[in-house]
């Protein structure tokens, strides 16, 4: 199949999606089996390469001494999954059309799990539901991937299919997939060069994959530099994540758990990096179960909303130099009542580092905008650093960088937006300048950097970025909303977007509704106590 990787991904998707349409299957019924076949094709490719290498090495030693038989361990020591004959992709493709193909693929998946214990209960085994004609066509389609492809083509195909399935599955898709450009921006700002990574809402593992690519791009081996840990509530999504790691040549300790109540990795103070896209505005969390949990050093919110539970999970998992980057509902930046008190303590700790406002239509499930939060516990250690004192005369640990990226995007289609590689690099460079670090320009951000930062040093840019002191944040009611600080660029009036403004007002209404609900609970509680006292 000639052509670049993007062409390969699109052609494979078009072929697979056409088969889905003809099969009358729902996307949710089709996605996991198809992703499983991509995984199998990857495993077969790696096994075939390792098999040739092992045989070549044995041929070179032939005659020197008696050689033992080749074993499963010979493949595992090379980091390759062992595939018995019945699990080879070519064997499945060559099966006669009269045979039960679904049953044969199920057997292949079971055999792989038996020979590779790390994959126990991970691989899909529901291929008998798809029908012979569909499976034969899928096998032939994926068999077209060339065996001598360069780079991470299988991982990119898997990731491409994940995104497409997430888009087609709507709300369910958004539960397991974060748009890649959002993930890349988080990774570029926290810069996970080396250390232990945690995603306590790991979904299909996109944060891990992009972190590994970041390490590779800086000429290092991810397996040597980063250790991967995750938790995910939905069992099927855990399996997607483990397959995703495998097709990218990564290993990780990802477990099924409800992060509100379970901390299987004993995370407090343990991790160098935390990344996540948690579910927003979750209610009915049983706070009695977690009231003594050390993961919540600033106390539990009284409001029936899980946002500040998640924020503290991320904060508490960081070690003394750790950084976190995560997606959060806009309402979290201005929430009042007990959530304000938690936010105040977080800001006073000095860990709040960078806040990035992202526009609407970046996600597949909701059109609302969001905010990216970045924490850095290492900021408190900057007193002796040459970069510690900013141009405004205040140590960096007493400031927060606010970036308004709501008007920075590429329109993918009518309903979806994304960041381009140059835009991601540009936004990350603003954070790098704020931290006194060297910028990167390999992705095409040079022109944007020259326009706004011609001297190569940080400065506030109206409508884009502003460094704000803790005192000024306190004066604004401890708000972490970039829109309150960054101001408006001169051309903003011409670019006025009614939908964008309506969305912002909707977010403000959410905050007010949350506050009203919290006050209602307080009044109800106080009334109950008063009646008990009078009785």
Model-derived regions, located:
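Non-catalytic, mostly N-terminal accessory regions of nucleic-acid modification and defense proteins
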Residues: 1-193, 253-267, 357-361, 378, ...
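Conserved Class I SAM-dependent methyltransferase catalytic core
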Residues: 27-30, 34-38, 238, 242, ...
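Active-site lining segments that contact anionic ligands and/or coordinate catalytic metals
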Residues: 30, 271, 293-295, 305-306, ...
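A generic secondary-structure signal for well-formed alpha-helical elements
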Residues: 41-54, 165, 215, 219, ...
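Conserved S-adenosyl-L-methionine
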Residues: 172-276, 281-285, 290-297, 308, ...
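Feature representing long, continuous alpha-helical segments
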Residues: 209, 239, 276-278, 308-312, ...
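Short, contiguous acidic/charged loop-to-helix segments that flank catalytic cores in large enzymes
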Residues: 285-305, 330-338, 359-365, 414-422, ...
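Leucine-biased recognition of intrinsically disordered, low-complexity hydrophobic segments
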Residues: 382, 389-391
């Amino acid at each position: 199949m000639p052509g670049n990787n993007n062409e390969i991904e699109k052609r494979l998707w078009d072929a697979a999606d056409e088969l889905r349409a003809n099969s009358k299957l729902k996307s949710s019924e089709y996605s996991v089996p198809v992703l499983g076949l991509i995984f199998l094709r990857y495993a077969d490719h790696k096994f075939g390469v390792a098999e040739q290498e092992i045989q070549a090495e044995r041929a070179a030693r032939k005659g020197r001494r008696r050689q033992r038989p080749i074993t499963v361990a010979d493949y595992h020591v090379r980091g390759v999954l062992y595939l018995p004959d019945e699990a080879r992709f070519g064997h499945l493709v060559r099966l006669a059309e009269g045979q039960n193909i679904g049953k044969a693929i199920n057997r292949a998946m079971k055999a792989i799990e038996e020979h590779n214990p790390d994959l126990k209960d991970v691989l899909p085994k529901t291929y008998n539901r798809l029908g012979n004609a569909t499976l034969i066509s899928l096998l032939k389609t994926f068999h077209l991937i060339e065996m001598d492809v360069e780079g991470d083509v299988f991982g990119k195909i898997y990731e491409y299919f994940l995104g497409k399935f997430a888009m087609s599955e709507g709300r369910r898709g958004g539960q397991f997939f974060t748009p890649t450009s959002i993930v890349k921006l988080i990774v570029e700002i926290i810069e996970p060069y080396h250390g232990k990574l945690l995603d306590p809402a790991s979904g299909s593992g996109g944060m891990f994959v992009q972190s590994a690519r970041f390490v590779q791009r800086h000429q290092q081996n991810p397996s040597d530099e980063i250790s991967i840990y995750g938790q995910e509530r939905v069992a099927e999504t855990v399996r997607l994540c483990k397959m995703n790691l495998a097709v990218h040549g990564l290993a990780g300790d990802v477990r099924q758990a409800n992060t509100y109540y379970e901390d299987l990795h004993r995370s407090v103070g343990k991790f160098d990096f935390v990344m996540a896209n948690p579910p927003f505005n979750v209610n009915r969390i049983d706070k009695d179960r977690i009231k003594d949990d050390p993961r919540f050093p600033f106390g539990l919110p009284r409001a029936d909303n899980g946002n500040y539970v998640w924020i503290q999970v991320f904060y508490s998992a960081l070690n003394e130099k750790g950084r976190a980057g995560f997606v959060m509902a806009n309402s979290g930046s201005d929430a009042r009542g007990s959530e304000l008190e938690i936010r105040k303590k977080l800001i006073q700790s000095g860990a709040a580092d960078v806040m990035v406002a992202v526009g609407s239509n970046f996600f597949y499930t909701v059109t609302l905008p969001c905010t990216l939060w970045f924490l850095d516990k290492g900021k408190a250690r900057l007193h002796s650093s040459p970069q510690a004192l900013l141009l405004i005369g205040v140590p960096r640990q007493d400031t927060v960088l606010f970036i308004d990226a709501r008007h920075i995007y590429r329109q993918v289609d009518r309903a979806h937006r994304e960041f381009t590689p140059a835009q991601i690099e540009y936004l990350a460079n603003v954070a790098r300048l704020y931290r006194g670090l060297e910028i990167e320009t390999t992705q095409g951000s040079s022109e944007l950097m020259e326009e706004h930062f011609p001297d190569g040093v940080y400065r506030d840019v109206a409508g884009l970025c502003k460094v704000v002191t803790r005192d000024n944040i306190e004066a604004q009611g401890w708000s972490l909303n970039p829109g309150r600080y960054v101001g408006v660029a001169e051309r903003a009036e011409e670019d006025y977007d009614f939908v964008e403004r309506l969305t912002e007002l909707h977010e403000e209404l959410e905050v007010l509704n949350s506050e009203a609900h919290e006050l209602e609970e307080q009044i109800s509680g106080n009334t109950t106590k008063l009646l008990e006292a009078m009785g």
